[in-house]
A protein has these predicted regions:
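C-terminal anion-handling pockets and recognition modules
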Residues: 91-149
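RNase H-like polynucleotidyl transferase catalytic core
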Residues: 1-5, 74-93
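Acidic/histidine-rich, metal-coordinating catalytic segments
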Residues: 40, 51-65, 89
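Generic structural signal for small/hydrophobic residues in well-ordered secondary structure
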Residues: 14-15, 21, 60, 89, ...
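Short, aromatic/basic amphipathic alpha-helical patches
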Residues: 67-75
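Single, function-defining residue in the core of a domain
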Residues: 49, 57, 62, 78-81, ...
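Extended, low-complexity cationic-aromatic segments
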Residues: 1-41, 137-148
């Protein structure tokens, strides 16, 4: 019997607006300052962040979140939660929702895993009520300034 081990990875960036349940997702092959910069740029473009629309993102202290090479787009402001406090991060409650479709499954190819995760992210994006129930803590700020179009 020949055993061939190899490892390939996909990483999932998840962004959530707890008050609305809106999510944005980005699957990537790397987590690094450059990867996070690309994720922030993609996110800013999707939500229209810029000079007239500002977003606050709450992040943990992961190395790629604080990388010296990180490029933060205009309109995005990063706020870092205290160390070892995942309970303060609403996005942490997204991961069990994603994991439930991949747990205890054998994927023959990385693309198969990517397809399953992408489909799950699409399902979650189309079910903001489910996301909101999991991420909108009673103490989390609500929107006090409705979007003006």
């Amino acid at each position: 019997m020949c055993l061939r081990r190899r490892y390939q990875w996909y990483y999932l960036f998840g962004f959530v607006h707890p008050a609305s349940g809106r999510t944005e997702w980005l699957l990537t092959t790397t987590v690094s300052g450059a990867g996070m910069s690309a994720a922030l740029k993609d996110f800013a473009a999707r939500v229209g962040a810029g000079t007239t629309r500002r977003m606050v993102l709450v992040l943990d202290g992961a190395g790629w979140h604080r990388s010296k090479s990180l490029v933060v787009p205009e309109g995005i402001h990063l706020v870092f939660q205290p160390p070892y406090s995942p309970a303060l991060q609403p996005a942490e409650n997204l991961w069990p929702l994603v994991h439930e479709v991949v747990a205890n499954r054998d994927f023959r190819a990385l693309d198969e895993l990517k397809d399953v995760v992408s489909e799950r992210c699409t399902e979650l994006s189309s079910n903001p009520a489910v996301v909101k129930r999991r991420t909108l803590y009673h103490w989390w700020p609500r929107d006090h300034h409705p979007k003006v179009e």
